[in-house]
Structure formats: C-alpha cells, structure tokens
C-alpha cells in the first residue's frame, strides 16, 4: 500500500506538444473554430481536476505556445525537442509530483470523463499494491490519457537508453514489465470504440476534426461529451467520408458543380474546388456556394491540399471519391484513386488506362455513343419534376433559355433575339438571373432551350417542348442520338428554318417529343424516383478489394469486367483475376449456407449431397497419397508418431490466438489421436492413428473429404468458420475439428498434407493464407486445392457470362498461369493440375444434348479433357521451401 500517495497526492497534468510534427507540422496551431487546435485541447482538459496544469513543449515551440498556454491557464515548460522522456523528467524533478497525467496536444476530443475515471482507478489500484503505469484500452484513438507515478518515470529513464523509449514516455514503463507494473484496463462499454479515431495526426484527421468541432458545438461547450462524440463518430458521413470532385474548368458550365454541391449538401460530404482559396472562385460558383447550406469546413481548396489528404495514410482516407468531370483527365483520376475508391458520373472518358483507375462508372444521362461500357445505366436517377403541364403545348408563346452558368459559346443572346423575332417571349437563366429550384418551374414555359443534360430531360418530363443547342460536338451527338432537336449557331440566324422547327413542335401533339427514338421516357420511367443520394451513400460502404496475392492498390491493374453490382480486375503482377468491387452482401457462412442456399443452387442440401462429395474426395485423397508416397517420410510410417498431430485435449496440439480452447471441438475418444475406435476399424490401410500421416482440411464443412481421407489412410483434422459444421464433424463423424480462422491458430505440429476444396477463392487475403499453409506443411508435404478456372471454356470464350455468374464471395479466379506463378512465390512446386467440371453443352451458343447427340457430346467431352477446358481445376503441389515470411 502506498500511503503517501493516498493521503494527499500531488497530481499534475502535462500536455505534450510541439510545432515540429513530421506528419503535420504546426498542427497544434491549425485553426479550429475561432481559435486553434491547441486552444481546444487545453480548454477541454481544464475540466480534469488536478493540482496543476502544464504544457510541456520544446525550445523551438516556446514562442508560439506561450500566449496560448497563458490564455488557457496552463504553465509553460520547455525541454528537449526529440528526447520527450527527458523533457518530462526535467519537469517532474522541478515539480516533484506524486502522480502525472499525460495527454497530447493533438487530441482536441479527449474524453475528460474517462480521464477523471482513470485517475480514480489509478489511486484505487495503488491503495492495495503498487501500479507504476495505467491507461484505459479500447477508447477511440486520441481520446485517452496515461497516468504514472512521477518517481517511477524518473527510475525508468535511468534504466533505458532505447531511442524509442526516449522519443515517447509511456514505453519506458510498460515495455519493461520486469521493472514496472503496468495496467491496461478495458474501457467501459460506453467508451469501448477502439476503431474510432479522433486524434489529429494527418491533414485528413484535421479536416474531419473541423466537422466534429462544428457538429459538437465545441465553441460553446466547456468540455467534450464523450457519449455525444461517439454518437457523432458513428454517423454515416463521419464513418464513410465522401469527397466530391466536380469539373470547375472554365467554359464547362455549372451543371457538374451544381450536382456535386447538391449531393455534398445532402450527404454532408467534402467538396473539392480546384482554386487556391475562396477569393479565387468565379462569381457563378461563389453565388452557388453562398446560396447553399454546405459548411465551409466541408470545402477543400487547391491541389496541394488534395495531395496533403493522401499523405501519411495507412489506407485511403475517403470511403468514396465521386467524380463529375464530363471527361475525367488522367491527373484527376490519379488523384482520386489515391484518396478512395472512385465512382464517376456520366464520364465521357474512353481511355482504358484512365478508366482503370475508376472503380465504378454510373451513367445517368444516356451516352450511347461512347466506346466504353459503364457498370450501370440508370436514367431513374435523373431528377423528375413534380410540377407538370396538364395539357399538351399546341402553341409556343413563352420560352426559357438555360444554357448553363457560363454559356461560353454565347448561345443565350443569339437564341433570345431569334425567338423574339418569332414572337416568343423568353426568360433567360444565367449567373445574374438564377431561378431557384428550376426543375419545378419548367412547366410554366412552352419551350425550353438548353443543352444536353438534366434540364433537357426534366423539361421533357414537365411537358414542355425542348430544343437543344450544340455546345460541343459530343453534346450534339448525344442530343441527336436521344431524338432531340439540336441547333448550331448558324441555325438561329436562319429565321425560316427556326420558324419551321417551332411549327413542327407545335403540330406534333399526336406524336409528342416523348415518342421519339430516345432510350428513355422520363414520364413513364418509373413510378418511384431513384435516389442518387442513397445510391452513393450505400456505395460508400462497399469495400474496395485489391489483389488478394499482392494485396496492394495497383492502379495499373486492368479492369476486365463491369456490371451493376461488381467490378473485376486482373493483377498486372501475378495475373490473378480478382473482385475489386462487389455491392451484393456476402454470405456469413451460417448453417443456411449449407442447407437453404446450397439447395437453391444444387437442388439438394449439403448433407444430402454428402456421399457424392465424399466420392470425389476419395479420388482426390488417392491422388494426394500417390504423389506423396515416395517423397514424404511420414507416409511410410517413418517418425510418424513423433510428427503426429494429436486431437485437442488438455495437452492440446495447438492454441488459438484471439480464440480460446473452447473453439476446439473434441473428438469423442481421447484414447486415439484422430479417430474413434469405431472409425479406426474401418481403415483400409494398415496404419494406426499414431502412425497415419496427418492431413488438415481447411474449410472442411460437414466433413465428406475428412471421411474420404480417413478411408485412404490419412489421420484427418478439419477446420471451418462454421460452428454448426465443426460440431457435426466432431459429434457425428468423430474427427477433431477447429472452429475459427485457421490463419491465426498456432498449430504446434506440422502436417503431411493440407487441402482446400473450393475454399481458396473465398479468401480476401491470399498472402496470409498461403504463408500460413506453407508454415503448416512439412517440407515435401502436399498442398491440394480446387477452384473455378479462368482457363476453362467459359472463362476463355464466354468471359462476360463467366464473370457475371461468379459467386459474390469469390475474391479470386485462378488460371493455370496464375497458379504456377503464385504458388512458386510461396515455396510450392506444382506436381499435377487436374482439369475438372467439363461441360460440352457450354461449347456452343445453342446447348447440345447428350441424349439427342451422344456422339458429338462425347467428342466435345474428350476435347475438353485433352485441352483442359473444364470450368474448374484441381492443383496438387509440394512444399519445396519455407517462405521467408513463415517459420517452421
């Protein structure tokens, strides 16, 4: 018991900070609200009840921090810049505190209630036994503090010369358990959100902090309400930040900007403006911003700030970057792809290299002439006006001219004069004369003259007549392809031609413009208007996947397939085809996966199909046995008992990291290592469980291959992430099985064989998986797996359908070429490739029948086998070396 501390402890709070941060220099001086980040940190911490408050900085920062410390009621102390441990020790020697509370100057949202609780707990713990260091684990990153005994830190500094210990403070204590007692107490449930981040370590952190500060109204609050902060941090726009990047290039109008601005308002997203600051904004953009509800905190100005957002990030900072560029240039695509997964709206870009950096292409306005395919065309996202004409226009008396915010080609005045000569009274929409909520005002006019874009389709839906102007060649092409009348400048100078066009529009009541060859009819498009806002929000929550082998964001990877729900890429390094984007929810592999889902696909449940799967397993197990007989000593019984993996028991053969032994399902008999006595008597090979070569089946499901492997002579062991499956394997089949993630399980013995049957494609990270398999196998051990084949008839000749029909939980699609390259990288040599899944009916557009044409059927079957054109294949390989990342 530490009576001196308990009686009247002197507790001081030290905030550590400096301007020389390597990742974000001078971040403590960044504006936050009306003052600075450091102001908010110090103001917040003043509510923690201690004896005295200090700001411990370095000599170079002293002049910048002195006035802030004084204003906030903190005493300033200066010490070495890089030896932070020494800085703290000097202050402790000066003040001689019993207890020190340490916080950092880049955490403006620190939980002061958790800090006060921590002090109380630290004193309680020290009432019974000495605790040198205390902190709460599980708080949002940037919300906690550290507490330690002053004398203990001085002692720790004397004992360590490690640079890391001196660059920080706490490690000098908690990294030396032989000398000091440290307690990491789990956070209370209300604070336990370790995945949330509230610190300011990067420019992106700062931009997020600006939002949090405004939402929490920190300007008017004495300290942070932790529960409110957690609530806000779990809001969609904080958890899934979205960046909108419109085209703001001169001469491209305001349509792209207005769409992004509207979406940013609705989703509380960030808006990038390609200007250095607000003063450089053109008047039309400035007016639109002033009339919007978007916060200044949501604006990001200039390319330099855009670059800073990507700096020092372990992963892409934004959940989604939305491009609205008309035609996305290479530089913009490069920027966007470094910041988050990329969705582009109505993109006229056709260059495959640039499009390869765009994860999802959404075409809302029809663009049939483009030489590229989008993921999805959905004109229902075009906003539909609620106000519509009740009668068709028979005489055009009024017109609205809306050519965009800039009208660089000068159509507005030309059209106004030309239509005026025909007696049509016109109203113009421009920067100086905007019409709020223009979409709902269109029905008031007989004629709308605009360019190809939303307004054209909205006007059509409102019942007005529509004439478009050819602002660009592409706009002209698209307008004509959708059945709109499209005029060039010269047409407005031809009064007779224009008069004839107006007359045609007036007399086409029986054949309204909505009956032209346009791809869509807005009025009849859909009963309910699709929400672009909701689509973008949902898409922001979709995960971007990278090559499961190389596991890196490689913008050189080619996109080989797009559809409404997915994007598929091919790795430029290892040639693996992989799922880049998948919007459809992925199965959780619960019991229904093997029963209802399996039956829907195959007409029977997994257990009803057990014998058929087992028969295939017998063939596979025999191949594995044959390939290994002359190479793996244990297959002949040599040293088998020593190498045998035992069934889990009190002396378990493995322990699971992040798992307890309750995940390990016991085989019914503890007398044998793998088999019950009943099962042992049925073995075909003359090997006892102690001498049988061991086999681990990863993704064993309900155990048909385990049963086949046992009959072949193996001592089988299973693992699966489905608990119902491993329970069945243990209780019904009598084989030991482990429920959980095999990659984080510490198997203390190695196996002679490892198998994965239609499992390997389900792993998102194959690098981890293949390294683990290598470590599980003895040298010369056999690794066998089966998987869908990109080298088969469907993958080669019906690629689009093949990729379209690939299950949503298949992260990779293997080919013979990629298998050879990838397996070699992980220390395996392929011994045999078996092409399977032969389907003669898939060789022709029109399916052939085995019953009606048996000769052709069998001929194609033989061709498929000879040229290995099956839609699945099996790989049998041997471990020839340990991968550098693994340890035997």
Where in the sequence are the language-model features?
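N-terminal nucleotide-binding beta1-loop-alpha1 segment
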Residues: 2-24, 241-246
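S-adenosyl-L-methionine-dependent methyltransferase catalytic module, highlighting the catalytic core
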Residues: 764-772, 782-880
């Amino acid at each position: 018991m530490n009576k001196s501390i308990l009686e009247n402890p002197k507790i001081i709070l030290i905030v550590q900070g400096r301007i020389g941060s390597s990742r974000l220099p001078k971040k403590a001086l960044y504006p936050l609200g009306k003052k600075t980040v450091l102001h908010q940190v110090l103001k917040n911490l003043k509510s923690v009840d201690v004896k005295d408050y200090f700001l411990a900085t370095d000599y170079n920062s002293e002049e910048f921090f002195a006035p802030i410390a004084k204003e906030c009621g903190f005493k300033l102390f200066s010490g070495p810049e890089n030896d932070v441990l020494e800085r703290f020790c000097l202050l402790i020697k000066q003040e001689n505190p019993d207890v020190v509370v340490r916080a950092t100057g880049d955490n403006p949202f620190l939980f002061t209630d958790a800090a006060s609780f921590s002090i109380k707990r630290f004193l309680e713990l020290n009432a019974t036994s000495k605790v040198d260091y205390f902190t709460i684990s599980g708080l949002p990153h940037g919300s906690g503090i550290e507490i330690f005994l002053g004398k203990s830190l001085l002692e720790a500094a004397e004992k360590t010369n490690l640079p890391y210990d001196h660059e920080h403070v706490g490690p000098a204590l908690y990294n030396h358990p032989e000398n000091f007692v440290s307690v990491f107490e789990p956070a209370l449930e209300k604070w336990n959100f370790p995945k949330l981040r509230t610190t300011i370590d990067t420019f992106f952190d700062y931009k997020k902090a600006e939002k949090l500060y405004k939402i929490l109204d920190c300007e008017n609050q004495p300290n942070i309400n932790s529960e409110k902060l957690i609530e806000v941090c779990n809001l969609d726009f904080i958890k899934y930040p979205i960046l909108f990047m419109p085209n703001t290039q001169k001469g491209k109008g305001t349509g792209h900007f207005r769409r992004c601005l509207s979406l940013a308002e609705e989703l509380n997203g960030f808006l990038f403006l390609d200007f250095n600051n607000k003063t450089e904004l053109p008047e039309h953009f400035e007016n639109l911003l002033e009339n919007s509800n978007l916060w200044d905190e949501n604006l990001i100005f200039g390319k330099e700030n855009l670059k800073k957002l990507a700096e020092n990030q372990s992963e892409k900072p934004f959940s989604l970057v939305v491009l609205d560029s008309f035609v996305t240039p290479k530089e913009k695509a490069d920027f966007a792809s470094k910041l988050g997964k990329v969705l582009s709206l109505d993109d006229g870009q056709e260059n495959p290299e640039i499009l390869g950096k765009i994860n999802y292409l959404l075409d809302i306005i029809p663009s049939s002439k483009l030489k590229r395919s989008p993921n999805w065309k959905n004109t229902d996202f075009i906003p539909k006006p609620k106000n519509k004409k009740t009668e068709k226009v028979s005489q055009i008396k009024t017109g609205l001219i809306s050519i965009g915010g800039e009208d660089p080609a000068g159509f507005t005045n030309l059209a106004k004069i030309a239509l005026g000569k025909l007696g049509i009274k016109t109203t113009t929409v421009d920067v100086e004369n905007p019409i709020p909520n223009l979409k709902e005002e269109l029905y008031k006019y007989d004629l709308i003259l605009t360019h190809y874009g939303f307004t054209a389709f909205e006007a059509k839906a409102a019942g007005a007549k529509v004439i478009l102007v050819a602002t660009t060649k592409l706009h002209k092409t698209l307008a004509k392809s959708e059945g709109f009348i499209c005029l060039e400048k010269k047409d407005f100078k031809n009064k007779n031609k224009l008069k004839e066009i107006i007359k045609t529009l007036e007399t086409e009541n029986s054949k309204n413009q909505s009956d032209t060859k346009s791809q869509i009819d807005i009025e009849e498009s859909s009963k309910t208007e699709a929400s672009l806002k909701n689509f973008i929000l949902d898409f922001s929550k979709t995960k971007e996947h990278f090559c499961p082998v190389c596991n890196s964001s490689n913008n050189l990877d080619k996109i080989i397939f797009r559809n409404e729900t997915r994007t598929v890429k091919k790795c430029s390094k290892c040639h693996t085809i992989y799922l880049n984007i998948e919007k459809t929810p992925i199965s959780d592999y619960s019991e229904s996966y093997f029963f209802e889902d399996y039956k829907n696909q195959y007409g029977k449940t997994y257990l009803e199909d057990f014998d058929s799967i087992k028969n295939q397993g017998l063939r596979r197990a025999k191949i594995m046995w044959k390939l290994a007989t002359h190479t793996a000593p244990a297959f002949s019984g040599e040293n088998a008992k020593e190498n045998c993996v035992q069934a889990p028991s009190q002396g378990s053969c493995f322990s699971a990291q992040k798992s307890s032994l309750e995940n390990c399902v016991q085989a019914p008999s503890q007398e044998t290592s793998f088999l019950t006595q009943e099962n042992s008597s049925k073995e075909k090979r003359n090997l006892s469980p102690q001498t049988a070569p061991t086999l681990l089946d990863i993704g064993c499901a309900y155990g048909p291959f385990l049963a086949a492997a046992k009959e072949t002579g193996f001592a089988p062991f299973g693992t699966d992430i489905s608990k119902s499956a491993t329970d069945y394997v243990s209780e019904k089949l009598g084989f030991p099985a482990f429920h959980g993630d095999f990659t984080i399980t510490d198997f203390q013995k190695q196996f002679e064989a490892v198998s994965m049957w239609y499992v390997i494609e389900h792993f998102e990270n194959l690098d981890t998986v293949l390294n683990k398999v290598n470590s599980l196998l003895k040298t010369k051990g056999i690794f066998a797996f089966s998987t869908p084949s990109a080298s088969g008839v469907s993958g080669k000749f019906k690629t689009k359908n093949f990729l379209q029909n690939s299950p949503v939980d298949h992260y990779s699609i293997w080919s013979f070429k990629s298998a050879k390259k990838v397996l070699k990288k992980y220390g395996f040599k392929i011994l045999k490739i078996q092409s399977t899944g032969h389907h003669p009916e898939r060789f022709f557009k029109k399916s052939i029948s085995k019953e009606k044409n048996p000769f052709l059927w069998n001929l194609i079957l033989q061709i498929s086998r000879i040229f290995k054109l099956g839609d699945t294949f099996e790989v049998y390989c041997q471990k020839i070396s340990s991968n550098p990342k693994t340890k035997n």
